[in-house]
Amino acid sequence: MDKDSKVVIIGAGVFGLSTAVQLAIEGFKNVVVVDRHMPPVPDGSSCDISRVIRFDYADEDYLNVSYEAYLKWSKDPKFKDIFHPSSYILTGSMTGGDESWIDRTTRQLSNKGLAWTKLDDAATAKSAFPILSGKLAEPGFKGYYNDAAGWADATKAIIQLRDECLELGVSFISGPAGTVVGFDTDSENKIRSVQTLGGISIQGDHFVLAAGAWSSNLVPMYNSTLATAQVIAYTPLSDTEVQRYKKLPIYANFNTGWFNFPPHADTKTLKMAVHGRGYTRTPSKGEALIEANISTPRVYPSCERPNLCPSEGEGRLRNGLREILPELADRPFEKVTMCWHTDTPSGDFIMDYHPDYQNLFVGGAGSGQ
């Protein structure tokens, strides 16, 4: 690619911004990021108080990439106020169907010479982490923990990426002028420009679609992805409780999909979520560019995630909290909401050129990973 060519990136989340930074570092002089909102985009899946940083994967390639990322998060001084080390427990019940997944993960860790500690039962887990007061994943408990893990303050990370983009000369277009509603193509299905809600055309030589769950609004994904909303809750904590639970590990139950974070000191909340099949939403008529049976979040207005989630989802959140900290399980949540994921059948990312457009590269499908 000619480094004087213009690259237009659709989406100002972690995929789009990190792509922009890398292109600028490699010498591309004309990189433009377009989105409905300047980052951090308030309803984007990259933005919130926390995201898990781990390298525990059953797939060797994902483990290698995520381990490299973990080393950068944990050792690079620029992440000192963003990355927070924490132990990570992966557990579940052997009565479920996913027992082999934990075995494959620990085997990959061992093959790479990375430490992990087996947890034979709930009592062993409580001995290692006395703050866990619930019954945990019983009966048939199976699990392990890894001390080389942690979490990142996601919104702070996005702000840092945005500022790095600006320092490197990346341009941003937001608001109606940055809300993409269509493409102008030539006779060979090569995109010449994107059309926006504000009525302007943004020309480019190369285009990157990194719009997360909104991507299927713009191009057909041919059943390769499904946008799903996952439930999240935040329990308020007192100053004393923030200190009491500060050594709480990240605990993930692979049977239920429930997981938590340690307390977030800035907001004085304990965050938890469920990563499962999620909820879908059918767009209203005319909302999506693609006339197909798709699931998608609202396109506009771009706004903070609403304080609501299905009652069934709230029940799963409380059940998971009761599993590890029953003393907090009936406390009113400060907020419940939903985060939109782009899931693939295999849980793999998609990084490839779109089959319908010569110069459109699709990056994303994070699948909640």
PLM-predicted stretches and their roles:
Residues K3-S5, T196-H206:
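Core beta-strand elements of the Rossmann-like FAD/NAD(P) dinucleotide-binding domain
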Residues S50-I131:
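Dinucleotide-binding Rossmann-like beta1-alpha1 core, especially the glycine-rich loop
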Residues V21-E26, D81-P85, S201-H206, A213-N359:
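Active-site substrate-recognition segment that forms the wall
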Residues A24-S45:
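Glycine-rich FAD pyrophosphate-binding loop
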Residues D2-F15, V32:
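Beta1/beta-strand and adjacent pyrophosphate-binding region of the FAD-binding site
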Residues F15, P39, W214:
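Conserved Rossmann-like nucleotide-cofactor binding loop
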Residues A58, A149-W151, W340-T342, L360-Q369:
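Glycine-rich phosphate/pyrophosphate-binding beta-alpha loops
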Residues T95-G175, V181-K190:
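Flavin (FAD/FMN) cofactor-binding and adjacent substrate-gating region
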